[in-house]
């Protein structure tokens, strides 16, 4: 996918809303044995990258260092007319950092009040001497809004056939 196409998809207001306000993504990657994994994980959107963080010793760190291609989805909506999703494919770069990455704390701030956040940050700083900062750079992006008719192409094609 071309950079301008990626930028276009990411700039759609609904995509921006999901990227900046949702607290969870589902990250897909290949495990060390070559089988797929999908995990829910908190994230932070920097404007250019999706950043997730975890313990430096987490199994996903070694798996992503070995195979950096990933996919993720950020979604919302409980009914078909409310269903929205940003699907991203890209490469993950893993950096082991001292302490707690700021993006990890920023992701938590989206869902915690000030008191809970202070306790969470203190607990994290006590627990983690190091963390893995995993930055995912999009190489393909699609925003879907089922209620607004922004559907995957195959569904658009099926819907078009039904209207003939």
Name each model feature, range by range.
Residues 1-10, 81-164:
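Charged, gly/pro-rich active-site loop segments
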Residues 2-26:
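Short, basic/aromatic recognition patches
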Residues 21-22, 66-67, 130:
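Structured helix-beta-strand junction loops
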Residues 23-56, 64, 71-75, 84-87:
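Short beta-strand segments
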Residues 56-57, 139:
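A generic "binding-loop/recognition-motif" signal
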Residues 78:
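Active-site-proximal loop/turn and secondary-structure-junction residues that shape catalytic pockets
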């Amino acid at each position: 996918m071309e950079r301008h196409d990626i930028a276009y998809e990411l700039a759609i207001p609904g995509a921006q809303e999901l990227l900046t306000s949702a607290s969870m993504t589902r990250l897909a990657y290949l495990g060390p044995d070559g089988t797929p994994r999908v995990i829910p994980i908190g994230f932070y959107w920097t404007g250019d990258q999706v950043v997730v963080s975890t313990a430096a010793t987490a199994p996903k760190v070694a798996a992503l260092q070995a195979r950096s291609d990933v996919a993720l989805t950020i979604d919302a909506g409980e009914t078909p007319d409310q269903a929205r999703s940003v699907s991203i494919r890209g490469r993950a770069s893993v950096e082991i950092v001292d302490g707690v990455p700021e993006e990890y704390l920023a992701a938590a701030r989206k869902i915690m009040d000030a008191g809970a956040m202070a306790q969470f940050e203190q607990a994290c700083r006590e627990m983690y001497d190091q963390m893995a900062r995993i930055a995912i750079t999009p190489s393909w992006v699609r925003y879907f809004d089922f209620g607004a008719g922004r559907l995957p192409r195959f569904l658009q094609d099926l819907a078009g056939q039904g209207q003939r």
